[in-house]
Amino acid sequence: LELGGRVFYVPNIKKDYFGYIKAFRKLLSQEKYDVVHVNMLSAANIVPLRLAKQAGVRKVIAHSHNASAPGIVRKLMDGMNRPRIKHYVNEKFACSEKAGRWLFGDKAFERGEVTLVANAIETDKYGFSESNRRKIREKLGISGDALVVGHVGRFQVQKNHEAILRIFHEIQRKEPAARLCLIGDGELKEQIQEQAKKAGVLDKIIFTGVCQDVERYLSAMDVFLFPSLFEGLPFTLVEAQANGLPCVISDQITGEAVLSRENVTMISLAESPEKWAKAVFKMKEAGRIEREEAARRLAEAGFDIHKEGQKLM
C-alpha cells in the first residue's frame, strides 16, 4: 500500500458464488489489468483464471503453493480442474518442484513449462535478535532459560496441530518448564485448545493469534516444530531458518525448503511422539546458526526476495 497498491474486496466464493463472479468480472472490466496472478493452494477454484481469460487479460498466471489437498470433495475438484488450467493461463509458476508437479503435472514440468519462484523473504528482517528475544519473552511471561517450542501456521488439518500437542505433551513430561508458542488462527483453534485442556497442558501453551511481527517471536523460540501432513514449500519454515532456529519437521515437506541439514531434522509422521520429543531436545542442544551464516545460506538457496522478485518482472 505504501507503494501505491490498492486492495479490492469481493464476496467469499464459498458463501456467495454468483456475487463473487459478478464482483470479479466488474473489477476486471473497470481496471483493465495486463496481468492477473493467482496464488493457488489447490485446483478446487479455477474461477479467477477463467474469468481473467474471458476478460481478455494479456497474461494470466497460476502459481502453485501446495502439494496436496485435504478432503474427498477437494480432491475430486482438483482432479477435474487440473487439466483445465492450461486453457486459461499463459504462465505456470510454482514455489517448489513438488508443488509444480502436483498442480500442473509431470509432463508440463519436464517440458519446462513451469517456472520455479521460491517463497523469498527479506533476509535482514528475519535475522535473530537478542533484543527481540528478551522483549517477547517478557511480554509472554516466559523466563529467560525456559525451553520454548514454536510453530507458525493456520489452525487447519494440513498443519497437524494434534501431533504438535502429542509431541509437546512428551516434552512436558521431561521438562515441565517448557512452553509451546502457537502463532496463527483458524477453524480448528478452539478444538485444539480443548484437546490441550484435556491433556493438561493448556496453561503451558501460548496462543498468540495472527501476528504482524512473526520475526520477533521467532527470536524468542528455541526450536521450531513443523509436523505438517503436506506442504508445497512452507514460507514459515524458510523464515524460521532465516532466524537461525533449529527445526524439527515432517518427512512430507519438500527438501527444497531445507537450507541445511545441520539445523533441520526431518522425521516420519509414523514415528512416535517420544521420538519427535527427543529430536526437539537434541536440536535445542545444537543451538542456533549464526545470523550471518543463516543469511548466506538463505541467499544461496534462492530465497532472497530481491533476486526472486526479478522473475516476476
Task: Report residues per predicted region.
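A short helix/loop element that forms part of the nucleotide-sugar donor recognition site in Leloir-type
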Residues: 24, 127-142
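A conserved mid-protein helix/loop that constitutes part of the nucleotide-sugar donor-binding site
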Residues: 147, 151-173, 187-193
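Active-site donor-binding acidic/aromatic loop of nucleotide-activated sugar
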Residues: 188-191, 202-211, 217
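A charged, aromatic-enriched C-terminal amphipathic alpha-helix characteristic of glycosyltransferases
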Residues: 125, 140, 287-313
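Short hydrophobic beta-strand element within catalytic cores of glycosyltransferases
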Residues: 237, 246-250, 256
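A short, active-site helix/loop in glycosyltransferases that binds the activated sugar's phosphate group
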Residues: 88-129
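Aromatic "clamp/platform" in nucleotide-sugar-dependent glycosyltransferases that forms part
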Residues: 41, 210, 229
